């Protein structure tokens, strides 16, 4: 029997200003869905896998075809409902309603675990959407580069006087998310040694200039890191190997990185983490015929790696979990102090979230890189005093290779996002841009996620696991008129550990879009300020007052 999730066809988004659908509001999700499966974007496009273990864009290839066909005929007063990658219904709504509403991987809490999900997945009843895979706004590794860069810069500020020159970062994983780490480290002024078990992923990062060099030798990798740091150069190297083997070996040798983290796909113990002593081919085969054995061996291996990370931490080396739930896996394997070192959000990012600052991103539906160059310039024009952001945009222009449709990631917050959206829409209206653009974000944002081991770890009021907030965020974005809205479970950290929402809005140059953009791009980050103000963060409370938010139970207004 043929595999409904495997097809050798090549998918690429249309370019230019010619419509394949009835309007840009349906053309936009069509192009971004297809862009998610572009071979220059997705990790395993022939299997519908975009990134993050088994994060897919559609449940099966038949479902992909049905979604495409439906979007091509969808009217501007209709909404398509997508249930775990399957187009289940079209309903009449109104012109300001989302054209697509997506729910991926959601399970009743008692059943929200990998065993039950994998059973449903095997029967063809579910799909893992990760965060931006099933919500059709993945833009390649660039999507996490700036967040990783901001994390490394803040780590340098806290631990090394704001200067990472001559220092190096040890990490694992070069997949769709982890692949951003070497480039982010170099942009922050540091060297990076990234351990990756799958050589094809390292080659992908080499091809797209996210990593500088590759080796199979630990000794060679360390020699290069030593030479680069002594010379004050910022360069990166991918080491083909298993992090569960390499990290303990470095501890044994007494090697001391300056920062330690990890972005293997440890959130998924079957599809995301190579067990110690296994070949990649053996691992892939047993995922299908003996997943329980894979999970058992992978979890034991994660415990070994986390113990090594604890050893680095206990040696005084800044060590953080980068949101893949590897500490939780080690804890469940009996490593009682697995959470001794922090996650990256409470350690470095939360003050940004308190002001609604997060991973704002946009993509040029024209396919023309010049449209991104023009929007980059517009950002600088509208935010003239944000020199840190200007520096980021300059580095991004120089170092980041576009994957699929040209796109940009740019961390901005409440008060700035709607201004940029309106300016971009005006650029479409007056012909400065060759076609409309879409604006979206990662689900990793200030008000759109509940994830106690990542974004909402160690909240001031103890509300880490309260998931009302992403539900309210999705509802508000729907009411505000986003072009498509998504509500997912399990992204980043795996089944049972997160709920999160996403939105994308199309700048088609119309006055209707102006009104929608102003609502969506104000309300969306405002929910993040609200959420952190409710938890008692002074930065968020002050920002809420400054921005004039009406928060009756929080500000009493």
From Swiss-Prot:
Its EC number is 4.2.1.49. The active site is at residue 410. Its cofactor is NAD(+). Pathway: Amino-acid degradation; L-histidine degradation into L-glutamate; N-formimidoyl-L-glutamate from L-histidine: step 2/3. GO terms for molecular function: urocanate hydratase activity. GO terms for biological process: L-histidine catabolic process to glutamate and formamide; L-histidine catabolic process to glutamate and formate. Keywords: Cytoplasm, Histidine metabolism, Lyase, NAD. It comes from the Bacteria. This is Urocanate hydratase. It comes from Brucella ovis (strain ATCC 25840 / 63/290 / NCTC 10512).
